[in-house]
Amino acid sequence: MSPQPSRSPDRFSLAALAEDHPTAPAQGDESESLPCVNAQRGEPNLRVVDCSGARRDEEVAVEEVLIPYAHGSDPEDVPGEPPKSRWWLSSGAAVAMHVAIIGALVWVMPTPAELNLGHGELPKTMQVNFVQLEKKAEPTPQPPAAAPEPTPPKIEEPKPEPPKPKPVEKPKPKPKPKPKPVENAIPKAKPKPEPKPKPEPEPSTEASSQPSPSSAAPPPAPTVGQSTPGAQTAPSGSQGPAGLPSGSLNDSDIKPLRMDPPVYPRMAQARGIEGRVKVLFTITSDGRIDDIQVLESVPSRMFDREVRQAMAKWRFEPRVSGGKIVARQATKMFFFKIEKRR
């Protein structure tokens, strides 16, 4: 591998020249011409000069190599004359060795495509423009948010006072309806019953509006939860709308066995409500109560349930008419009053 030319193309390695062209013993001032290294440029040949005049021993020969220069490069160097000093030779050899090493490295290392210049061409200049980056605009400090104005407390409007409850007016008792005359059905011929001895009257809790002379004592005064009998709606022996004989419980042919009074409702008693209930009912052939109908209720539906519950437990003796047990209708008036303590 031959070294590439550098900025000093006339300097080469002395060692390479010595190996390729060994020197011969000098005789007098004779010199041996070497082939021209820079023959392409037309530079003069190198000469190896034998310094025989300065040797002390015949066996030792000192050879000096003169580094050629281009014609007219240095006016002081004259071809054929010895060098000025020895240090110039050593320094030139060192420089040549460094140049050769650098040239070898440059040859081996790949060069960029831009730097592959032709012979005698100058490297192209590269223009570099420095751009100054704009500084980021600092965010402008925002003014502190104004504190929200305190909202005035809402003034609560005074709530209107609830209206006072109106006092409950006691219902006025309705006038008793006049009993309508019942059309008598066609009377059928009935066999006359055999006369029986009259039984002794049993004390009862009912009494008619007009006390009968047969009763031994007047009925007890009404108390809370007790009832008093009502007036007759039809005379004894008459028939009701269903074709059954009707009358009042005061009739002698109606004999009760069990008559529990109704219970006074707690709500009505607590409010001091009094009233009355009139019912029409049927006494079956086995002495039970059936078909209870409310004819009058004051206040409306206040005591109806208690009356029905009490009458469901009533029992009567079967009524015999013409040798047969028959059913009949009857009416009853219940009064609900509160005893006042003295």
From Swiss-Prot:
Signal peptide: none annotated. Residues 204-215 have a biased composition (Low complexity). Residues 1-87 are cytoplasmic. Residues 154-172, 191-201 have a biased composition (Basic and acidic residues). GO terms for cellular component: outer membrane-bounded periplasmic space; plasma membrane protein complex. Residues 109-342 are periplasmic. Residues 140-153 have a biased composition (Pro residues). The chain crosses the membrane at residues 88-108. Residues 157-203 are annotated as: 18 X 2 approximate repeats of [KE]-P. GO terms for molecular function: energy transducer activity. It is found in: Cell inner membrane. Its main location: membrane. Residues 224-239 have a biased composition (Polar residues). Residues 1-39, 136-260 are annotated as: Disordered. InterPro entries: TonB, TonB-dependent_transducer, TonB/TolA_C, TonB_C. Keywords: Cell inner membrane, Cell membrane, Membrane, Protein transport, Repeat, Transmembrane, Transmembrane helix, Transport. Sequence repeats lie at residues 157-158, 159-160, 161-162, 164-165, 166-167, 168-169, 170-171, 172-173, 174-175, 176-177, 178-179, 180-181, 190-191, 192-193, 194-195, 196-197, 198-199, 202-203. NCBIfam families: tonB_Cterm. Belongs to the TonB family. Homodimer. Forms a complex with the accessory proteins ExbB and ExbD. Interacts with outer membrane receptor proteins that carry out high-affinity binding and energy dependent uptake into the periplasmic space of specific substrates. It could act to transduce energy from the cytoplasmic membrane to specific energy-requiring processes in the outer membrane, resulting in the release into the periplasm of ligands bound by these outer membrane proteins. This is Protein TonB. It comes from Pseudomonas aeruginosa (strain ATCC 15692 / DSM 22644 / CIP 104116 / JCM 14847 / LMG 12228 / 1C / PRS 101 / PAO1). The lineage of its organism: Bacteria, Pseudomonadati, Pseudomonadota, Gammaproteobacteria, Pseudomonadales.
